[in-house]
Amino acid sequence: MWSRRGLGVSRAPLHLLLGVWGPSGRTGGQRKGASLARPGRGGLASCSVGANGKRDVLFLRKTLTNTVEDIQIDNFRRKSDLGVGSPDWKNLLIDVTREDHENSQNNSKRRCKVNCETDQR
């Protein structure tokens, strides 16, 4: 998956390159008092542009996964609050949709009124 050449260092020992993600690094297994390898603190892994890039990609992937899961949980909670599964859930969902539509219509009317009062369109 990741070659040494892709990490930007061709002849460095692999354990030095992967030290940031090892058992005493960012991924767990840290002992009390042990310090994490951080950018700018020395060591090949922290200085390697490729290693920092890999860490950034892993961080972004985790962040995006958490965001998607949060959205799915929110959607599930909203459906649960509406009583999805009960006989009247479709009517409740239609009411919410209609309310959202009315809110957007009111907002656009307000914007038009403000624009007309200031002679802008």
Swiss-Prot record:
Residues 24-43, 100-121 are annotated as: Disordered. It comes from the Eukaryota. It comes from Homo sapiens (Human). This is Uncharacterized protein encoded by LINC02872.
